[in-house]
């Protein structure tokens, strides 16, 4: 499960090679919905496989499936379009420059060795974006862990509560496609800030509703959970936005480091929410934590420098 976090390091680098800067949000929006499609499919397929093979052999079956995908990717995927004689999608014809020299090549020319990790660690945006992503993940994980529990704890059966995730999953796919393309037209950090603020407001609304309604109705619960889930489709913009703060040679290292920093929030979210729920006896307080985390991360996102500014500064210093 933890290996899924590798995408934070890999996808931004691949997308930046295959898509022109003004199409990277669109490119990322084509990739990230795959997880939501898989979740919807597995909701039907996984129980059938487990019932037929047992849970232990089901893991073996899925392992074989993943191995097949690995071989397929190794045989068919390419690092960049130039390997196939192509230009990045969206790049004007005849304007695609030759690949930028690698850091090692620059080092030979300048007489000094350059470490991508050192370059990334010295950039303020790495820690700024890492702080944002850690706080965001704290709220995100607190929400995902308690969507269903917030309904079952208020009298709804498990199947009814779980259906809210299906609705949210479909809306998330749509959101990822829309905001990914919109981020190609507007500053990505602003898109991130706006979407995260929406998550915070919706979470606060859901918490207030649960705390002030002795017997919550089905439709309002579906409404809040589905829209909170949909607003997390901003992950498309987060991944493409993080990658644009680095040049091609440092991009995987930079986004990988940001993805590592966010582990703090991923583990703290469910833990803190669980402690608060045990202390108060009400699941609604999990969404109070979500709201606070999202509003804080919203301000952190808006305070980020523009990607073009960071790139220009990096180029001037190197």
Features from the language model and the residues they span:
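Cytoplasmic helix-loop-helix junction between adjacent transmembrane helices
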Residues: 1-34
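C-terminal membrane-cytosol helix-exit motif in multi-pass small-molecule transporters
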Residues: 64-96, 300-305
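Juxtamembrane intracellular "pre-TM" segments in multi-pass secondary transporters
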Residues: 86-128
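Extracytoplasmic gate region of multi-pass secondary transporters
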Residues: 123-176, 239
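Helix-to-loop junctions at the C-terminal end of transmembrane segments
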Residues: 176-187, 277
């Amino acid at each position: 499960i933890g290996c899924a976090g590798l995408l934070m390091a890999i996808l931004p680098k691949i997308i930046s090679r295959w898509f022109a800067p003004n199409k990277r949000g669109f490119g990322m929006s084509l990739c990230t919905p795959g997880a939501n499609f898989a979740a919807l499919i597995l909701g039907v397929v996984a129980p059938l496989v487990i019932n037929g093979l047992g849970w232990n052999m089901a893991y073996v079956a899925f392992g074989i499936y993943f191995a097949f995908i690995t071989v397929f990717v190794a045989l068919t995927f390419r690092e960049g379009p130039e390997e196939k004689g192509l230009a990045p999608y969206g790049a004007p014809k005849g304007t695609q420059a030759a690949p930028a020299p690698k850091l090692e090549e620059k080092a030979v020319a300048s007489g000094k060795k350059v470490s991508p990790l050192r370059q990334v660690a010295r950039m303020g945006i790495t820690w700024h974006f890492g702080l944002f992503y850690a706080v965001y993940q704290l709220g995100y994980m607190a929400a995902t862990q308690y969507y269903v529990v917030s309904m079952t704890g208020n009298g709804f059966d498990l199947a009814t509560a779980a259906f809210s995730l299906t609705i949210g999953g479909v809306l998330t796919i749509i959101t990822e496609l829309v905001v990914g393309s919109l981020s190609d037209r507007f500053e990505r950090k602003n898109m991130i800030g706006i979407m995260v603020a929406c998550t915070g407001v919706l979470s606060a609304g859901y918490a207030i509703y649960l705390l002030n309604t002795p017997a919550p109705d089905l439709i309002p619960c579906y409404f809040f959970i589905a829209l909170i889930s949909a607003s997390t489709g901003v992950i498309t913009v987060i991944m493409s936005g993080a990658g644009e703060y680095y040049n091609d040679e440092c991009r995987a290292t930079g986004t990988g480091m940001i993805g590592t920093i966010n582990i703090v929030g991923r583990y703290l979210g469910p833990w803190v929410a669980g402690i608060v729920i045990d202390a108060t006896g009400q699941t609604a307080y999990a969404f109070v934590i979500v709201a606070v985390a999202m509003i804080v991360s919203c301000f952190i996102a808006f305070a980020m420098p523009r990607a073009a500014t960071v790139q220009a500064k990096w180029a001037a210093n190197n």
